[in-house]
C-alpha cells in the first residue's frame, strides 16, 4: 500500500522539476505532463499486487468464527471478538471481508428463526411465478389462526434482514441485543402469534450481460450528431473514472442490475403488502407492532394507506427510535390522535428507561429507551414494551384507555 503512494510522490516531484526547467506552464501543460508520467505505470497491476483477492469464506467455520453459549461471536482458536482491521492499511479489503461475514450472519439468523423459534418461511409475492424475483417473511404456525394476539416485527433500513435489529450488535455484542429472537421467544411464551417482516429485501441483483450494458448506453432517441457528441463526452468521462478506479477499486467488480420484487420494491410497499395478504387476514383480535427506526416510518405509511383497517385491528404500537415524521408524511389529524393514544416511541436518551422525553411533534409519546445508542433501543426497551402491550390489552378489555408508559407528566399537544 505504501509503495504506490511513494510512486505518486515521486511523480509529483518529477512534474515540479519539469516546471522549474521549462518555466511555469499553463494548466493544460501541467495536466498533459502528469498524464504522460502516470500512463507509464500500470496502476492496475500495482494495486493488485498490494490488495489481496476479494475472495472470502462462505461459512462461519471458514472464517474461523462461531457463536458461544452466550451468543457472542468469537474466534475458534483465540476466543477473541471479531477484528475488523484484519489487514493493516487495507480498509476496502477489510470492509469487503466484513460484508461477506455479514451475509453469512444473515443466513445464520434465518436458520435460527426456523430452528430455534420454529417459524416458517413464506414466499412473496404469494402468487410469484417460478422465474420472477422473490422475497420472503417468517411466521409462526399460528400467526393467521391465533384468535387472541399477533406480534408483528419490523426492523430498520440498511443491510439488516428479517430477524435482525442491527448487524453491528450481532457481530460485536451478541445475538440477544442484535436480533429479534428474544422478542419472538417472549411472544411465543405469552401466547402471541408472530410475523417477522423483511422490508429491505426489495430486489435481487443479477450480472449484466454485454448486450444489456451496450443497450443502456445506446437506448436513446436523440439525433445521431448529438448522440455522437454525448458518446464522446461519456467515453472521456469513463476514461477518467477508470483511471481513478485503478486506485480505488483495482479488482474491478462485475456490473450488476437490480430486479425489483413485485409489490415489495420498498419497505413501505412491503409493509402494505404483508398487511393486505397476511395481517389483515389473521384471526387475532389484538395485533401489536414493534417497529425500529425506518420501520416506524413504514408503519406510519401503512396507517396512512390503511387507516380504518389499522385502527380496527391494531391494539398498540411500540416504536424504537423511529424516524417517522407525521408532517413530512402528511399524516392526518385522526391518525395523529390515534397514535397519541395507542403508540409509544422508546428513543435514544441519557435518561433512565421509561422517563418521559419531550417532543415538538404532535404524535405519539416519547420515552427513554435507557440508552444513547440508536441500535440498542429495541433491546434495552424490551421488557417495557411487553408491559406496555399487556397494559394496552387490559385497558381495551376494560374499555379504559391505557397510559402509554409508567411515567408522569404526560406531554400535552396542541393541534396546529
Swiss-Prot record:
Residues 211-248 are annotated as: Disordered. Residues 223-236 have a biased composition (Basic and acidic residues). Keywords: Cytoplasm, Glycoprotein, mRNA processing, mRNA splicing, Nucleus, Signal. Transmembrane segments: none annotated. One of its GO terms (cellular component) is endoplasmic reticulum. It comes from the Eukaryota. GO terms for biological process: mRNA processing; neural crest cell development; regulation of alternative mRNA splicing, via spliceosome; regulatory ncRNA-mediated heterochromatin formation; RNA splicing. Residues 1-23 form the signal peptide. Disulfide bonds: none annotated. Glycans are attached at residue 397. Pfam families: Arb2. It is found in: Nucleus; Cytoplasm. The active site is at residue 293. Its main location: nucleus. InterPro entries: AB_hydrolase_fold, Arb2, Arb2_dom. May play role in the regulation of alternative splicing. May have hydrolase activity. Belongs to the ARB2A family. This is Cotranscriptional regulator ARB2A homolog. It comes from Gallus gallus (Chicken).
